[in-house]
Amino acid sequence: MSTPSRSAALFERAQKTIPGGVNSPVRAFRSVGGIPRFIAKAAGPYLWDADGTRYIDYVGSWGPMIVGHAHPEVVRAVQEVAADSFSFGAPTEAEVVMAEEICKLVPSIEQVRLVSSGTEATMSALRLARGFTGRDLIVKFEGCYHGHADSLLVKAGSGLLTFADTTQNAPSSTGVPEDVVKHTMVLPYNDVAALREAFARHGKEIAAVIVEPVAGNMNLVRGSNEFHQAMRALCTEHGAVLIFDEVMTGFRVALGCAQALYGIKPDLTCLGKVIGGGMPAAAFGGRRDIMGFLAPLGSVYQAGTLSGNPLAVAAGLTTLRLIAAEGFHDRLATQTRKLVDGLAEIAREVGVPFAADSVGGMFGIYFREGVPTSFAEVTKSDVGRFNAFFHAMLDQGVYLAPSAFEAGFVSSTHDDAILDATFEAARKAFKAV
């Protein structure tokens, strides 16, 4: 494990003024150990750290950089808008265009509200679902992460899998009252029987079911077709709101999002990451009758100073235009599948227990036999082997997510030459674990 001197110095300095030295916990490398890399710049599929070391990037800012870092057209769009000021706190034509584009690409969304983060989107969608139904109970699933709103921090994924006890049906974070999470029911992901039982017992109390249609915050776990069909049918039958959290999957796994892949029409959808093109942006939207409950029309309050920020909208609109090109997502899915198949083949050659999967431009790697289908199966992966693999790849210039419980991301700039370089590094890394 190498020690980057400049990043090490910055990390030590940062810890004096920033809790833990980072502004989001997973960045601290607590799960994998070692010194987090402080990034200086990025372009295409590459990152450069503060020491000048170049890495092939499979994090992509946790998903937004679907067309690669610093795409010239995205950069130009932001620069042009920035010349007219960064924010107005008033409506703009561009945010209307963004809303129209989202509604065109995602047929289940009849109206949409722009916000600044995925947490805002999910938090607001839940408040809206409760206001619309007049009910309090929320159903979520083990290992799914929907931002850090209090009511959703129970058996949650992402960084909480490193820092919290996820074995108990209790808040995953201190500072969250038990009285808040008592309105949150947590079920096993992909467990149709448990879902049906929950509705049989509590159907008249359930305001909403919120789900990552393809989980990406406990590593990548596909939702089964049966699971999605059951959620849709049960929510319809009992008058609950089905919320697809597509902050991660939205526009990344397909142009119409994961709901297009599964043929499911949720009542509300949460979006983020790609729609900001790397800038802070998110959204929630869905059925017109539900969205009509939002202020200023209705009684469900939601607001944000930077919602619809002009720079974020410019980056997002340009990114959406680029990914709407014919064949974009087919090519992205092909490259991502090449990546996981190639890694799996190398692991077999070396004799390391390993599995990998991908959906669109997302992928998961697991140090275990077989692709997991649930949170329980994910937690049986060999974290020690992943950590060793992570550092062996990092030392050879490949930047993976610094946690065994996070999905990875491929951009349109990850061509065959990039994959070949990744495979060359992987051959050495698998031998090190």
Swiss-Prot record:
EC number per UniProt: 5.4.3.8
Bilayer-crossing regions: none
Swiss-Prot/TrEMBL catalytic activity: (S)-4-amino-5-oxopentanoate = 5-aminolevulinate
Subcellular location: Cytoplasm
Required cofactor names: pyridoxal 5'-phosphate
The keyword Repeat is annotated on this UniProt entry: no
Keyword Ribosomal protein included in the entry's annotation: no
Gene Ontology CC annotations of this record: cytoplasm
Keywords associated with the record: Cytoplasm, Isomerase, Porphyrin biosynthesis, Pyridoxal phosphate
GO BP terms, alphabetized: protoporphyrinogen IX biosynthetic process
Gene3D superfamilies: Aspartate Aminotransferase, domain 1, Type I PLP-dependent aspartate aminotransferase-like (Major domain)
Highest taxon above the source species: Bacteria
Chief location category: cytoplasm
Pathway recorded for this protein: Porphyrin-containing compound metabolism; protoporphyrin-IX biosynthesis; 5-aminolevulinate from L-glutamyl-tRNA(Glu): step 2/2
InterPro entries: 4pyrrol_synth_GluAld_NH2Trfase (IPR004639), Aminotrans_3 (IPR005814), Aminotrans_3_PPA_site (IPR049704), PyrdxlP-dep_Trfase (IPR015424), PyrdxlP-dep_Trfase_major (IPR015421), PyrdxlP-dep_Trfase_small (IPR015422)
Residue(s) carrying N6-(pyridoxal phosphate)lysine: 273
Assembly and oligomerization: Homodimer.
Sequence similarity: Belongs to the class-III pyridoxal-phosphate-dependent aminotransferase family. HemL subfamily.
Name by which UniProt lists this protein: Glutamate-1-semialdehyde 2,1-aminomutase
Provenance organism: Ralstonia pickettii (strain 12J)
